Amino acid sequence: MTKRVYRFKEGNAEMKEILGGKGANLAEMTRLGLPVPDGFTISTEACMDYLNNGHSFTTELKKEIEKYLEQLEVSSGKSFDDPENIMLLSVRSGAKFSMPGMMDTVLNLGLNDENVEHLAKITNDEAFAYDCYRRLLKNFCVVFFCFYK
C-alpha cells in the first residue's frame, strides 16, 4: 500500500510535491524543534485520487486517516468523544505553491452543540467558545456546501 498520510515529524521542507507547501513547512518546523502541535498531512497524491475517484475516499485512505487521528488522540491526550477534554483540529488545504487567500480552511473541527458549553466553561469565556463554534459552522458551510463567504 502506498503511503498517503504523513505525520508532521515524518516530513521535511523538500517534500512540497508530496505534502504541499503548508504540509512541508509544518513538517520542517517540527523537524527543527519549533513548537508545532502534533498533526498530519494527507498527501497531494491522495487528494488527486480523491478527485479522480468521484470525490470519494478509498477504504484504505479512510483507515489510514483513522489511524492517524487515533495517534493524535494519544499524543494530545484529547478526544473527539470526550467533552471534558475536547480535541479540536484545523483542516487546511494546500498546494505546492503559496496561494494566500485562495485555499480553504476549517478551524475548530470537533466542536458541537454539547462540547461548546464545556469549552465556554474551561476558557471562562462563553462569547469566545460560541464564536469558535460559529466560525466552524460558517467555514464548514462555505467549504463543503459552497455557500458564499
Regions found by a protein language model. Name each.
Residues M1-K149:
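Nucleotide/phosphate-binding sheet-loop regions of phosphoryl- and nucleotidyl-transfer enzymes
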